[in-house]
């Protein structure tokens, strides 16, 4: 698909989209880990349907978190590149930098991958607690 005839717009589109996608993954990871600690993860997931109606927030959260665990190292580097692109646009890359940190962090928890969200969150928490 051709986005534009202008040089660099396709790359800028891809990187700006990555900020959004990887950012949602980072937010879900952090939110679900905290929610699991408090025992409210299902309540939080159910409440998200009011904002963004998806057929299965549990499956979406599991999928997005697992992608970060599986590909965190590569995604962190992509987010550092995105941060540079955001900065070149004159925007402080506060979120892009934070997303890169969360993706780096996620890469260290790859062993927690599971087809079950609760099991995956518990495995991450156990690994985190033992460090």
Task: Identify the residue ranges that each predicted region occupies.
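A short, charged helix-loop
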Residues: 1-7
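Disorder-to-helix initiation segments
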Residues: 8-12
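Helical "substrate-binding/catalytic lid" subdomain
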Residues: 13-116
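Short, basic/aromatic-enriched C-terminal tail that caps enzymatic domains
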Residues: 113-131
């Amino acid at each position: 698909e051709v986005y534009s005839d202008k040089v660099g717009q396709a790359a800028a589109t891809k990187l700006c989209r990555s900020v959004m996608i990887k950012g949602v993954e980072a937010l879900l990871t952090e939110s679900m880990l905290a929610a699991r600690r408090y025992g409210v993860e299902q309540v939080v997931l159910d409440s998200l349907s009011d904002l963004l109606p998806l057929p299965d927030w549990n499956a979406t959260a599991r999928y997005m978190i697992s992608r970060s665990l599986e590909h965190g190292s590569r995604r962190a580097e992509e987010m550092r590149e995105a941060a540079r692109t955001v900065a070149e646009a004159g925007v402080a890359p506060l979120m892009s930098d934070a997303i890169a940190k969360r993706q780096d962090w996620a890469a260290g928890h790859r062993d927690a991958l599971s087809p079950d969200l609760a099991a995956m969150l518990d495995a991450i928490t156990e690994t985190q607690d033992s460090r």
